[in-house]
């Protein structure tokens, strides 16, 4: 999870074949429970790609009152339209806000400039996670020293 300054705020390491969507809510819980942030669920705006577009994820984010901007997948749009008026209205989607998602991609791009993170040479997950956290800490300190 990254913030508007391209700094990683929460990290969760998963196997390569694991999907992104099941990790979203635990990652959000880690972020909100951390000492790093003092924002509440009402102050968070979650930007995600279509991988996080599952109806159960949207339902849980609404239940937690987390604002989110996630585009619908093509199959979801087609299914909703096939149901006609019983399909409900489409979820709110603001293109201008969604364009800010590039900060997330830039944060991961900056992180992958570190050779150990980009190439994943480490045999053990804990060692790799340590490298990710070290690189992230150094990136945050460099950003803070510039300001």
Model-identified regions with their sequence ranges:
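Aromatic-acidic/polar surface patches that form glycan- and anion
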Residues: 17, 124-127
């Amino acid at each position: 999870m990254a913030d508007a300054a391209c700094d990683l705020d929460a990290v969760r390491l998963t196997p390569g074949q694991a999907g992104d969507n099941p990790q979203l809510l635990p990652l959000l819980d880690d972020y909100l429970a951390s000492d790093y942030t003092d924002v509440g669920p009402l102050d968070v705006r979650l930007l995600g790609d279509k991988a996080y577009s599952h109806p159960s994820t949207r339902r849980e984010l609404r239940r937690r009152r987390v604002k989110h901007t996630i585009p619908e997948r093509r199959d979801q749009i087609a299914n909703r339209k096939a149901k006609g008026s019983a399909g409900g209205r489409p979820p709110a989607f603001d293109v201008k806000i969604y364009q800010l998602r590039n900060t997330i991609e830039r944060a991961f791009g900056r992180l992958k400039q570190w050779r150990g993170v980009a190439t994943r040479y480490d045999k053990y997950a804990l060692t790799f996670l340590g490298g990710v956290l070290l690189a992230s800490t150094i990136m945050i300190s460099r950003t803070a020293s510039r300001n």
